[in-house]
Amino acid sequence: GYFCNNRYKGIIGDAGEQGRLAAMPDSSLPPNVLRAFPFDDRRYGWTIKNMGPLYIPRAGDRIELDSLNYELYRLVVEYETGGELTCDGNLPRLNGEAVSTYEFRKNYYFFCGDNVVNSKDCRYLGFVPEDFVIGIARRITYSKNPFGTKLKSRCWKRII
């Protein structure tokens, strides 16, 4: 239930929300909420509470493609090449040609939202190409709860 990165030892994100998710029994979450990218229960069985390890691609890095990890990087390879990555038995194929390694052309990110239990983020969507990142939120100046009353609709705890 806790976000972690082997290159950073501190807390990533909202530890309270992550603790709340970690304490929730899996049975309390609907399967479409619990299951996570790449949605291959037979090979991975990853959930929003327990997934990884997962290498996040950087431009120039090369990985070996095999029948186990091709599904993790299929969308990235297809995005970068415009081709189709399939797996025939144990042999990944790009546009029908056997491929055993792939060198990434772009940098990618893996974003997770602060509303850990109900955030449609990379745990569902997969990697985000760097060129899709258009900015960084430095300050939240106004946040509104659409389900609050007129007087209690502002989320003052979110203003930083």
Protein language model regions, located:
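Extended hydrophobic leader/signal-anchor segments used for secretion and membrane insertion
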Residues: 1-160
